[in-house]
């Protein structure tokens, strides 16, 4: 009985110490899921050959697409990278005369999930107020001339987060594989630019900036 009691006490001390000095590495290594890879890594190295002229038409977001965010947390000097993801992404792009004429991307912010439900609840209710602002969007504002089927382009458009719109120029990596257009982007954002307070998770400090991440698999 004494041995069992000792084991219970040890477990309680270890878990309770997550927020204390002894806990940073335990928190990072055992209580936080390893961060997902960047969306750019999803673009296949095995690209199919395609002529830009053959990309003409309207393409729609298909299965396999996702969006979300990447932020860094700091616990007593120990860095932890957190990624949140949702598959509830919609939108389309239009290619005409070897030019990206239009693009609209919409994601359901309330559906973004990480490995921690409490973090997700804070994200929805306190940080982004998803009951008021359920969507985040990106809308292309300037046409982009396309010279390759697979390349990286700087694209200018309006991003809306938390009801706040900002004009941004973002890098988008493109590819073509299995008759699908692939688009990937990691967009640096500073929370205060969108009237969002950096999430406060008690013993964990969340940095005041992060990335919006998007991977799109588009079909005609």
Regions found by a protein language model. Name each.
Residues 2-220:
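Low-complexity, acidic/polar, glycine-enriched regions of mature
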């Amino acid at each position: 009985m004494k041995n069992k009691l000792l084991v219970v006490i040890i477990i309680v001390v270890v878990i309770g110490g997550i927020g204390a000095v002894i806990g940073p590495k335990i928190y990072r290594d055992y209580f936080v899921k390893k961060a997902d890879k960047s969306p750019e890594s999803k673009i296949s190295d095995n690209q199919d050959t395609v002529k830009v002229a053959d990309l003409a038409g309207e393409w729609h977001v298909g299965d396999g697409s996702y969006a979300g965010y990447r932020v860094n947390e700091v616990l007593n000097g120990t860095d932890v990278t957190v990624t949140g993801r949702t598959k509830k992404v919609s939108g389309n792009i239009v290619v005409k005369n070897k030019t990206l004429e239009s693009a609209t991307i919409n994601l359901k912010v309330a559906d973004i999930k990480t490995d921690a439900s409490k973090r997700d609840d804070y994200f929805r209710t306190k940080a982004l107020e998803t009951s008021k602002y359920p969507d985040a969007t990106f809308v292309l504002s300037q046409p982009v001339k396309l010279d390759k089927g697979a390349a990286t382009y700087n694209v200018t458009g309006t991003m809306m987060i938390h009801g706040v719109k900002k004009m941004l120029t973002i890098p988008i990596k493109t590819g073509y594989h299995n008759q699908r257009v692939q688009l990937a982007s990691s967009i640096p954002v500073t929370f205060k630019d969108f009237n969002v307070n950096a999430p406060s998770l008690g013993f964990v400090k969340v940095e005041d900036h992060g990335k919006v991440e998007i991977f799109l698999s588009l079909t005609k």
